[in-house]
Amino acid sequence: MTEEIVNASDILTKKLDGHLIDGEDTLLYDLGNLTAFDHSSLNKTEYKSNPNEYINKLSRDNVQLLISRLFQLPIKEIEEGSLALLPRCTTPIPRERSLPTSKPKTRWEAFAEIKGIKKKKKSSMEWDKEHEEYRPTFGYKKANDVANDWAMLARPDDKVGEDPFKKLEDEKNDRVSKQKKREQRNFDEASMRQMSNVGKTLSFDKEHRGQIKSDMEKVFDVAKLSTASLGKFDKRVENEKDAPKRGKKKLAGLGAGDVAQESENNSKLIDRMFKKENVLNVDKATRQFVKAEERENYSKKRSSGGKDNKSQKRFKK
């Protein structure tokens, strides 16, 4: 099947002739994200006379301009239908979640990167000369296994009376134990990089007591939910607080689908922008400032230990 690319602007006038917008197009388009931005100023008189009608008319015209611009893009015909070839996105959209962190490198990976050593993939099968067949390179019944030989060549460094087979087995056990130690060391180093508190001794002075208490409460809350019933049928300790209820986080106003509520919120926002009165709540700001000062004075008294107050009281007596 041959793929044909046609220009949708050729059929735009035939299909949407009665819905085209007359006037200058001042929108900024990002067709890759299917969005358009209107930076023109609002007409205050029309907005104050009928806000809802003005917002609806402006939104309808802008959406129609966006659709008209989309129809000017080339279209690719495939078996399932027609596809518009969108350009590259120009507006950066923030990520929903943070960027994934790279996995910490092991000691060998860091050493190989410095030395420029590249890992070569070794074949899983190897030719066994004795049995004249291909066998696994490692593991059970591996090829050219020295341990299966009934005779071994003597070496100059062999000691008299030493069992070469026993020596070979001991060397293998030593290599395995050393490899396990290296794996454990790499695991500890990687976990130390991920958790900054690992390896640090706890300090029970006054400065760290609050942090230690909050950490213990978090650990206790996690332990209460670690059973199969999520702590529902566990025995409760005397004066034990209920476990915190963790609900689903929801971003209010995003994708709710309530068009009327969204338009009402937008109209309220525009009303606040065009208000002549100051939006700042002076009483609320004053109360917050006074509370901040009281909190700061209280923390200063706690840090000084209240020695000045005690000395003043003694002097008065």
From Swiss-Prot:
Region feature Disordered, mapped onto this chain: 161-187, 236-266, 290-317
Major location (coarse): nucleus
A Pfam family recorded for this sequence: RRS1
Gene Ontology terms describing biological process: endonucleolytic cleavage in ITS1 to separate SSU-rRNA from 5.8S rRNA and LSU-rRNA from tricistronic rRNA transcript (SSU-rRNA, 5.8S rRNA, LSU-rRNA); ribosomal large subunit assembly; ribosomal large subunit biogenesis; ribosome biogenesis
GO CC, one annotated term: nucleolus
Keywords: Nucleus, Ribosome biogenesis
Ranges of biased composition (kind: Basic and acidic residues): 161-177, 236-245, 290-311
Function comment: Involved in ribosomal large subunit assembly.
Full protein name: Ribosome biogenesis regulatory protein homolog
Gene name as annotated: rrs1
